[in-house]
A protein has these predicted regions:
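Metabolite-binding pocket within alpha/beta catalytic cores that recognizes anionic/polar moieties
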Residues: 1-140
Length: 140
């Protein structure tokens, strides 16, 4: 696994014009944030060695480098899911590559529901903990 991570990171380093320390995984509903990224260059997942390819409708399947505001960032437009048949190692592979590239801060977004009656459509929720019901632990 480490060799694959290093191979993928080396490929991306050869394409990168900046050295971002912040990354965003754009989940369902936030893919349009990619339109706010300036000075961007995109790499399709299919072009990246060892990278899985998203099969979810609406996930564009691109890694985007550029600026959001004045900050150099890396963004994943589309991600991979356990329910698509990927192993947890494959699902977490991009995050491991990000770490190898020097990413220090990662924002992960998704569409979600809540049982709290005070929540309204469009509210932002910050996850402080989670329950793992997956048969395969994502941190292995």
């Amino acid at each position: 696994m480490l060799e694959r991570i290093q191979e993928t990171a080396a490929f991306l380093k050869g394409k990168m014009h900046t050295q971002p320390e912040t990354a965003i995984i754009l989940g369902t509903g936030l893919g349009s944030l990619a339109g706010e990224i300036t000075e961007k260059y995109e790499i399709r997942y299919e072009e990246i060695p060892n990278f899985p390819v998203s099969t979810v409708e609406g996930h564009s399947g691109k890694l985007i480098f550029g600026k959001l505001g004045h900050k150099d960032i890396m963004a994943m437009q589309g991600r991979f899911h356990f329910y698509e048949g990927y192993s947890m190692k494959e699902v977490t592979f991009p995050v491991r590559v990000m770490r190898e590239l020097g990413i220090k801060t990662l924002f992960v977004s998704n569409a979600s529901g809540g049982t709290n009656p005070d929540f309204a459509i469009g509210d932002l929720m910050i996850i402080t903990d989670h329950i793992n019901y997956f048969p395969e632990h994502p941190l292995r």
